[in-house]
Amino acid sequence: MPQLQCEEIRFPSADGVHTVAASMYTMPGVPVRAVLQLSHGMCEYVQRYRPMAQWYAQRGIALAGNDHLGHGGTANKGEHGHYGEPRGRYHLLNDLHTMNGIIHQKFPGVPVFLYGHSMGSFYARWYAETWPESISGAIFSGTAGPHIRNQAGWAVAALTAAVRGPKYVSKTLVKLNMGAYCNRIPDAVSPNAWISRDPEVVKAYDADALCTFPFTAATYREMLATLCHVSSRKWAQNIRKDLPVLLIAGTADPVGDYGAGVRKVWAMLGDAGVQDLSC
């Protein structure tokens, strides 16, 4: 069986400071009939998805994505967990658009489907609103729905960043945002036990320095501002009505409120008239 091929790509970030690290996975000898553009989650990076890329590439679906600002190979030393300088969320969004352009240039005429997971799904949802014609469909994986805690969390993060500084790491913010994630896991051996039912995946995550860093106050502010935006009815109404959208989530995933939040997003999009919608 041919080996999975990974092309590493670099391009300037929209922030004018960083160089974005990106990866593009294909299988030699297998024609590419579609591309899955990945928007990865919080505290991880694209190359964690190599097993998933292998599965798709064998079936003629390339997987390509960039490490977000503050993550993976895009973050400079000592900067992991921070993309919260002014307009940080906009830079992250624009980097996704640059990556999309690179994909279209590499595979002209091939449909591109945007796949956003967890935090990455918040930005994928915003992207689908902003540049709908650049994608053939969207998959929102492990996303979160509208909730009063989104606005409350943003307010606390914004205040903390203003008072303590944008790069301040607040244990209170970590607890408010993720402190309850293991509540339904009896005898959880790791604070990250919620990420997977497979203990080996949790062990690998815990051992990976590119995953085990905290977010700064300003990064929480930017992430939660994005979540608040894509939790609005206005966002849902702005989604292209004929855009195929698939929502998926683990039934034990706390980010999506154990499925309840995901169903709220599905209902919002349905109420807004999105026609090709699956959950």
For each of these PLM feature ranges, what is it?
Residues G84-Q105:
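Alpha/beta-hydrolase active-site loop
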